[in-house]
Amino acid sequence: MCLYSQNIKPLVADTDIVVYKHLVKRCNGNVHTPHQDTQVTLGQKFVAKGKLPKLPKNYSNNKIGEGVIHAYIDKTTAKSYLSQGEIIVKAVIKADTPFFVQVDMTEIAATEIVLDDDFQTYSEETVKEIEDNLDNTINVIYKLLREQNTHNGVSVGDYVLSDKSIVAPDALTKNMDVIGIISFFTKDGTPNVTALKQTECIWGRLTDFAVNVVNSLEKSVEDFNGADYTKKLYETYKDRLDDFPALKYCVEYETKGTKKGDWVLGSNGEVLQTVRNAYLINRSIEKLNEVKGDCGYADKIITGPFYWASTESGSITAWACGTGSVGDYGWYGKWVGNVVRPSLALGKTDTGLLSYVKRLFK
């Protein structure tokens, strides 16, 4: 069993956090893990075998296999096992224990956990306890994820306003004009801003040639040239934008404080880093929609579908990234319908966009 982590570096809490472990009971009465079939002892520390992996910073591989013990942090999953009569045991990840969290925030994987000395039994009190415990666990993880994704006082999930100021989720008020959300930082610390809205469309009609070719996985995850690529695509196809819906949606996107042409179709590396941080972005979107009193004010990043990038792999294929496992980025036919979400990203030659983003973060 593997976990596909959203955090590149292990998280470490300064307090104990509660999780829930699904187990199975054999005919001989022994208790085992359901996937690796490892026998465990209730009331004892359960330590993982193997070495904790080191994930690459470019997120080209987010798969966590050996070196960790899996458990659930999703309330719905834990309660479902409990209601079906499955064995669920409360467990604790002790303070200072390294752990990773699943992209969709359903599972956690730590180097060790301490199992409770008895199974959970179904009751209203138990259900309430599970909900309270996991709400607390999720909030601890959320704060750790924001801390790990902070640069110069700005965090992934912070709001960018139309007046170019930046506001943390806790400081948001209804009268603020939010235009985007910080989605990741480049190697030099420059923040990328993802739009509040998205659409589903094809990348474009088939052509005889490609404009922005990157034809290897290794190069695609290091590709942060979305502004340049968008500019080149626009210069090539500006007289036939209707044939390239993904490009058209991004270059025509505008908000209060921005104009058409300020937003771009991100490159593969930019899109991959954005969807990796989907949980932090979506938490901020939930808060924004709640404060605005409009559930459709901003669109959440969707788990499952793929997001188009401006990076091409050939005349008939382009790159797209999903919100799941390590395999969720690759080449797809340009006629396929995927999700498109504009961003404010830096390009080496796009001086207009460069000055705009620098003004944002003075």
Language-model features, listed with the residues they occupy:
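Surface-exposed patches in mature extracellular/periplasmic domains of secreted proteins
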Residues: 258-266
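Conserved NAD+-utilizing ADP-ribose enzyme module
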Residues: 1-55, 60-69, 76-141, 360
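Residues that flank catalytic or metal-binding motifs in active/ligand-binding sites
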Residues: 67, 87, 188-190, 261, ...
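Structured loops at beta-to-helix junctions and adjacent beta-edge loops in soluble globular domains
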Residues: 21-28, 92-94, 195-197, 311, ...
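Short, compositionally biased
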Residues: 134-259, 334-360
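Short beta-strand scaffold positions
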Residues: 72, 265-268
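C-terminal, surface-exposed recognition/capping segments
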Residues: 268-362
